[in-house]
Amino acid sequence: MAKTLYEKLFDTHVVYEAENETPLLYIDRHLVHEVTSPQAFDGLRAHGRPVRQPGKTFATMDHNVSTQTKDINACGEMARIQMQELIKNCKEFGVELYDLNHPYQGIVHVMGPEQGVTLPGMTIVCGDSHTATHGAFGALAFGIGTSEVEHVLATQTLKQGRAKTMKIEVQGKAAPGITAKDIVLAIIGKTGSAGGTGHVVEFCGEAIRDLSMEGRMTLCNMAIEMGAKAGLVAPDETTFNYVKGRLHAPKGKDFDDAVAYWKTLQTDEGATFDTVVTLQAEEISPQVTWGTNPGQVISVNDNIPDPASFADPVERALAEKALAYMGLKPGIPLTEVAIDKVFIGSCTNSRIEDLRAAAEIAKGRKVAPGVQALVVPGSGPVKAQAEAEGLDKIFIEAGFEWRLPGCSMCLAMNNDRLNPGERCASTSNRNFEGRQGRGGRTHLVSPAMAAAAAVTGHFADIRNIK
């Protein structure tokens, strides 16, 4: 029987499946951070259980770390306690930890791939909703809750029901300057923020194959923003070339054997999907969200939509509420909307290619008066590479703030946040009410678009910036 990539990944990891019961899956990699793990480790301690396979668990600090200092006390008592607990727990249970002073420290979904912890064909979990990022490698990766974190630590398994399957095909080639962020925002604009609910999405088509691994990570990172359980891109030569030589990747003959297996991780011809969505890449322009969910998105050259234009009464009501929160009026050109802050970072867009794209726009320009612009690399290695390439100097000379790695303003758990009423062009993944700070107004964009907003003071089409 012909199988989809998701079905192959799921079936090869079933440890046990009783009739009419939820299958038990083996978990190859477990990524841990300071926010969703303390209670899980406490649960192990209370029952006298060890971590079953500590060599398959990797920890880092990211969610509430300061991006201005490596001082563990910088972001308040709760952050300090969570980080101290992670240090204690990793030491006690034998888990590898990339702490604030480790050169590999960074956002968990940046650290995993760059260290070769993430590999094709794996099951990967983390107590974080954007674990879908790792699906870019042809791995089944999804976020879990704290009680499930404890279950994986204790057993290296997890009960998981089968999801429905969705194919999203982006046909043709994207225009110059159109990034993975624009593609995924256009997809979510078409499906809506709940269009993928109950599904695992496989992204395919020429425009997807053309993406680098970093672009594919951006794409899969936001699968969750259309309601999907996970996102997948089938592994190919781009994948294998990225993985080769990384710290935890197989070496020598083991790598060759792995590639031979990884090449089988494709959807079979004739396999059927429950849902199919198709987009034309050449029709996608630079995208900007205008509302309070990622599906409320338009082209940078469009006007703010009129809620009255929505046929669905639920969508109409959501649009009215979103415009009121965002302080926007229907019919205004998006390019006339001024911004207060810019955030370039997050597990969506903080890798070296993202920083290069932003620096290309920033070079030789200045941040507009009254705008605060932050650039937060996704990890220590990304920061080091950017500095080796001189990107930090480009940003600093343009008036951007060059920060230490962490999740930062994506979710405002540290000191990087919006004040009430402030408007931000952000490369992150969520524009919910209050996501970047109480009363803050978030517009999701690509790194180049964020840099363009920083230097012009408003949203601008990067295709017009020479």
Swiss-Prot record:
Listed EC numbers: 4.2.1.33
Record text on cofactor binding: Binds 1 [4Fe-4S] cluster per subunit.
Molecular function GO terms recorded: 3-isopropylmalate dehydratase activity; 4 iron, 4 sulfur cluster binding; metal ion binding
Protein name in the entry: 3-isopropylmalate dehydratase large subunit
Keywords: 4Fe-4S, Amino-acid biosynthesis, Branched-chain amino acid biosynthesis, Iron, Iron-sulfur, Leucine biosynthesis, Lyase, Metal-binding
GO process terms (BP): L-leucine biosynthetic process
Subunit structure: Heterodimer of LeuC and LeuD.
InterPro entries tied to this protein: 3-IsopropMal_deHydase_lsu, Acnase/IPM_dHydase_lsu_aba_1/3, Acoase/IPM_deHydtase_lsu_aba, Aconitase_4Fe-4S_BS, Aconitase_4Fe-4S_dom, IPM_dehydratase_rel_enz, IPMI_cat
Summary of the function given for this chain in its UniProt record: Catalyzes the isomerization between 2-isopropylmalate and 3-isopropylmalate, via the formation of 2-isopropylmaleate.
Taxonomic lineage from the root: Bacteria, Pseudomonadati, Pseudomonadota, Gammaproteobacteria, Enterobacterales
Cofactor(s) needed by this chain: [4Fe-4S] cluster
Enzyme class: lyase
Functional pathway: Amino-acid biosynthesis; L-leucine biosynthesis; L-leucine from 3-methyl-2-oxobutanoate: step 2/4
